[in-house]
Structures are given as structure tokens and as C-alpha cells.
Amino acid sequence: MTGLFPDNPEAPIDLLALEGQALRRGYFRIAGIDEAGRGPLAGPVVAAAVMLPAGLLLPGVNDSKQLTEEKREELFDVIHREALAVGVGIGDHALVDSINILQATLSAMRDAVRALSITPGFLLIDGISNIPMNIPQRTVKKGDSLSLSIAAASIIAKVTRDRMMVEYDAQYPGYGFASHKGYGAASHLAAIAELGPCPIHRKTFSGVKEHLPSQPDSDTAGPSTGLFSF
């Protein structure tokens, strides 16, 4: 076995290996960070930070994308019950359009860390981008399948965002947010083409911006004819 990646692809990966490395380097209060919602055409990007007791095992916790919705909901409660601290940060659609999705994601991650009731001593972050915070940290590609703390954060972020999109489905019917959660499903693209974008759509994203109402000259502007005015 070499590092975290076993020579036998069927061998299980030690989801506590990264946490163990940080502990051996003298870091304590380790928090895993992940996000949900970078790719959708609508809604927020949600980040979560989870700090687990050292050595805690959480059977079933893995990359949230590999779990069923029912399993994620079940583990969401388990993580909240077993974790030392859980924090959530949200970058709404307006922030995404204002500063771009990467910067909105990092902002949400920073807010999630700040929301922790215990100040972390080390951050394990899914992805390749550091969070602009004065806390020792390590980025991990595919971290939600390599670190238990990051995997737990991915579940918290995913369930939190999914619940928000179900609420938005009731607020903006016709788009199917409860089913596709704002991602670019064929039914979602068809709804945008038919109804036009709604207020929570990301207006800088392809698939949405093409359907924004044109901005007429102020001298010739008449009443808005779209379903939603911006």
C-alpha cells in the first residue's frame, strides 16, 4: 500500500488517515470542510465544517454523492449528534453572480468555519483552493472520499442545500427544484426556456443568461413582459 491509495483498489481507504497525519504533526481540533452546489444553475452554494472527536468512527459516512437521499438524512442527524461542532455557511445566488462561484464557495467555507462553536486548529478542505483564513490547512482532491471529517461535512452541506431547494420549489413552482435541486437537468432547462429565469437563478451561468430579458434603452422601455422582473 502506498500512502492513502491502496495498491489493491478493492482495499478500503482509511478515512482517518489524514486526520491522523495532522494529529501526529501536533494539530488538534481538526475540522473537515466541504461544499454542495457549485454546479447548479439556481440556488446557493452551501459549505459545512465538521469537527469530530479524534478516532471517532462513523459507519456509512462517505462522499455524500454516493449515498441515497434517505441515507444522507439519517447520517445528517448522526453527525450532528456525534460531532464536537458543526458550522454552515451559505453563498446565495446573488453572491455567486457578484464575485463568481469559486469566491462565493470560499466565502461560504470561511463562514462555515466561523460558525463552529469550537475554534479549529487545523482545516482539511475538499478541493484545491485554500480558505482565506489564518488557520493551518490542507487541501485534498476528492477529500470527501479520503477523509471522514470532510465526508461528514459533505453530508451536512448536501442535506442543508437540498432542504433549501425543496423550500424554493414551493416558492417558485414550475421549475422542479425539489427534484433536480437546481442542476441542469433537461426538465430544468426546458422550464427556464418556457418560464424564464426566476429570482434565484444564477444569471451569469450558461443555461440561464441566454434567457434573461433584454434591457431596452431607457427612452423606449415599456412594462416588463416576463414572469419575473429583475
Swiss-Prot record:
Residues 28-217 form the RNase H type-2 domain. SUPFAM superfamilies: Ribonuclease H-like. A divalent metal cation binds at residues 34-35, 126. It is found in: Cytoplasm. Its main location: cytoplasm. Its EC number is 3.1.26.4. CDD domains: RNase_HII_bacteria_HII_like (cd07182). It catalyses: Endonucleolytic cleavage to 5'-phosphomonoester. The keyword Nuclease applies. GO terms for molecular function: manganese ion binding; RNA binding; RNA-DNA hybrid ribonuclease activity. PROSITE patterns: RNASE_H_2. Keywords: Cytoplasm, Endonuclease, Hydrolase, Manganese, Metal-binding, Nuclease. It is an enzyme of class 3 (hydrolase). GO terms for biological process: DNA replication, removal of RNA primer; mismatch repair. Manganese or magnesium. Binds 1 divalent metal ion per monomer in the absence of substrate. May bind a second metal ion after substrate binding. The keyword Nucleotide-binding does not apply. Residues 215-230 have a biased composition (Polar residues). Its cofactor is Mn(2+); Mg(2+). GO terms for cellular component: cytoplasm; ribonuclease H2 complex. Residues 209-230 are annotated as: Disordered. Pfam families: RNase_HII (PF01351). Belongs to the RNase HII family. Endonuclease that specifically degrades the RNA of RNA-DNA hybrids. This is Ribonuclease HII. The gene is rnhB.
